[in-house]
Amino acid sequence: MQSSEGSPDMMDQKYNSVRLSPAASSRILYHVPCKVCRDHSSGKHYGIYACDGCAGFFKRSIRRSRQYVCKSQKQGLCVVDKTHRNQCRACRLRKCFEVGMNKDAVQHERGPRNSTLRRHMAMYKDAMMGAGEMPQIPAEILMNTAALTGFPGVPMPMPGLPQRAGHHPAHMAAFQPPPSAAAVLDLSVPRVPHHPVHQGHHGFFSPTAAYMNALATRALPPTPPLMAAEHIKETAAEHLFKNVNWIKSVRAFTELPMPDQLLLLEESWKEFFILAMAQYLMPMNFAQLLFVYESENANREIMGMVTREVHAFQEVLNQLCHLNIDSTEYECLRAISLFRKSPPSASSTEDLANSSILTGSGSPNSSASAESRGLLESGKVAAMHNDARSALHNYIQRTHPSQPMRFQTLLGVVQLMHKVSSFTIEELFFRKTIGDITIVRLISDMYSQRKI
């Protein structure tokens, strides 16, 4: 097999993920076409050589007993090839049978792998973020915390429960975001039903005294030890789902056109995931995660890249932990990441170059960069990005007056997150769970509440 003809770059800048060269894609049989659509096959599936797409389609159709109807007026005559294979499911399934796919091989195959994401979708379908309980965490400590993370054990607040008293400064109650942010942003976490809260006119909320007293009587779980790899993946999947619910709670975001919502979600899910890991899952057993991943992945080139990016991931988590980020700062960082003025491939110095923000319109190229990636409401997105930065800047001035560089430091950590590719997170935490489905497709379906 030809090794590196054309030598494509490992990193696809548009999607911040890995493009596999022919040498790296050892599963693809470039000389053996799929008998269904004539794309490159990946081996024998259900009795014939087929690509992953057609094999997955056949498996889902048989397991779910799908009955498709041909969309063409000429029943059963639709073209099924690489370009048109998704246009008519009835004809695609018919061709699968015609070329020899064996449905009994699907029925006698073991059931689908435990899909944490789909199970969480069922468990939390109508729940607000934080309404559910965290999965039970094993009591065994697998490795020493300080040795893995570089700092002693850090309290890990559990999502869905208030963080421990003293974790956030008392001056948080005095925070008032700037009026410019109030007019556009609603960054408050989703309201938990049946708990009275005092809603300020700025969109942030602070609990009433009665609510705080009620929470004080609620037993908080102990700080969990380092989790086993499978439990890290389980909890990571739950946070992925809760991130989607958090995004749904941001009023200004949901008022954007749906294509803009999906594009921004696709570009920011990675930063949301990293922030959730820092806020709720430190310290994390990366050593075991890498060990498990290496045992399942024989490609040394990919393994080396994932290992390097894990170090960048750990560096981001360490910095966020040492900065003692409070919940308001985390919300502002999420909003800054969500209302991204430029795609991830843009200059990584944009935020630092604009770190002396006031409440102006931002850099002159921000709207153009937003338009170039297809945003329908690029002006609104740029304005909300600036307002989120203003909210963070003014909050830090009020609450950390002795740390004049804190704002720039936090924006620097946001830029550092770009060093961790979506591919690495997808491979390390979700590949075994989601199979051939891309994480972007899965998140988009979750957000749109479409059945997967």
UniProtKB/Swiss-Prot annotation:
Residues 344-359 have a biased composition (Polar residues). Residues 342-371 are annotated as: Disordered. A zinc finger (NR C4-type) spans 34-54, 70-96. InterPro entries: NHR-like_dom_sf, Nucl_hrmn_rcpt_lig-bd, Nuclear_hormone_rcpt_NR2, Nuclear_hrmn_rcpt, Znf_hrmn_rcpt, Znf_NHR/GATA. One of its GO terms (cellular component) is nucleus. It is found in: Nucleus. SMART domains: HOLI, ZnF_C4. Brain and peripheral nervous system. Transmembrane segments: none annotated. Residues 189-450 form the NR LBD domain. Gene3D superfamilies: Erythroid Transcription Factor GATA-1, subunit A, Retinoid X Receptor. GO terms for molecular function: DNA-binding transcription factor activity, RNA polymerase II-specific; nuclear receptor activity; RNA polymerase II cis-regulatory region sequence-specific DNA binding; transcription corepressor binding; zinc ion binding. It holds the Pfam family zf-C4. GO terms for biological process: Bolwig's organ morphogenesis; cell differentiation; cell fate commitment; cell fate specification; insect visual primordium development; inter-male aggressive behavior; mushroom body development; negative regulation of transcription by RNA polymerase II. Residues 360-371 have a biased composition (Low complexity). It comes from the Eukaryota. Keywords: Activator, Developmental protein, DNA-binding, Metal-binding, Nucleus, Receptor, Repressor, Transcription, Transcription regulation, Zinc, Zinc-finger. Residues 31-108 bind DNA. Monomer. Orphan receptor that binds DNA as a monomer to hormone response elements (HRE) containing an extended core motif half-site sequence 5'-AAGTCA-3' in which the 5' flanking nucleotides participate in determining receptor specificity. This receptor binds to the consensus sequence [AG][AG]AAGTCAA. Plays a key role in the establishment of non-metameric domains at the anterior and posterior poles of the embryo. It may also play a role in the nervous system. Belongs to the nuclear hormone receptor family. NR2 subfamily. This is Protein tailless. It comes from Drosophila melanogaster.
